[in-house]
Amino acid sequence: MADIQDYNSTPKYETFSYLPAMGPEKMRRQIAYLINQGWNPGIEHVEPERASTYYWYMWKLPMFGEQSVDTVIMELEACHRAHPGHHVRLVGYDNYSQSQGSAFVVFRGR
């Protein structure tokens, strides 16, 4: 039991938080996967200090039926430009199961 300790680390907000940061190409592939599953992309943002205790703000409306990875990336970047200090995440809404199929932070706030 002497080996067990509490590790101080950055907060984890979603699946990929435990992996090294994704580069642009890996991000594109994740967005393409989300779209290929038939999930509707949606963008959310929040102040870093409120990320784990409050709902995240919706950026515009979910992009129902969007098939273009580039369009999703442009909206992610637009949200980040409008709210540079916020965390920005992409959510894939699954119509069939009426739940989130995927969610990951794209930009981390300061």
Curated annotation (Swiss-Prot):
Under the GO molecular function aspect, what terms does this record hold? ribulose-bisphosphate carboxylase activity
Q: Coiled-coil region(s) at which residues?
A: none
A Pfam family of the record is RuBisCO_small
CDD domains for the chain: RuBisCO_small
Q: Which Gene Ontology biological process is one annotated for this entry?
A: reductive pentose-phosphate cycle
Which controlled-vocabulary keywords does the entry list?
A: Calvin cycle, Carbon dioxide fixation
Gene3D superfamilies in UniProt: Ribulose bisphosphate carboxylase, small subunit
Q: Of which family is this protein a member?
A: Belongs to the RuBisCO small chain family.
Q: What PANTHER family does this protein's entry cite?
A: RIBULOSE BISPHOSPHATE CARBOXYLASE SMALL CHAIN 1, CHLOROPLASTIC
More details: The basic functional RuBisCO is composed of a large chain homodimer in a 'head-to-tail' conformation. In form I RuBisCO this homodimer is arranged in a barrel-like tetramer with the small subunits forming a tetrameric 'cap' on each end of the 'barrel'.
Query: Briefly, what is this protein's role?
Result: RuBisCO catalyzes two reactions: the carboxylation of D-ribulose 1,5-bisphosphate, the primary event in carbon dioxide fixation, as well as the oxidative fragmentation of the pentose substrate. Both reactions occur simultaneously and in competition at the same active site. Although the small subunit is not catalytic it is essential for maximal activity.
Q: Describe, as the record does, how this protein assembles with itself and its partners.
A: Heterohexadecamer of 8 large and 8 small subunits.
Query: How is this protein named in the record?
Result: Ribulose bisphosphate carboxylase small subunit 1
Organism, as annotated: Acidithiobacillus ferrooxidans
| Upper classification of the organism | Bacteria, Pseudomonadati, Pseudomonadota, Acidithiobacillia, Acidithiobacillales
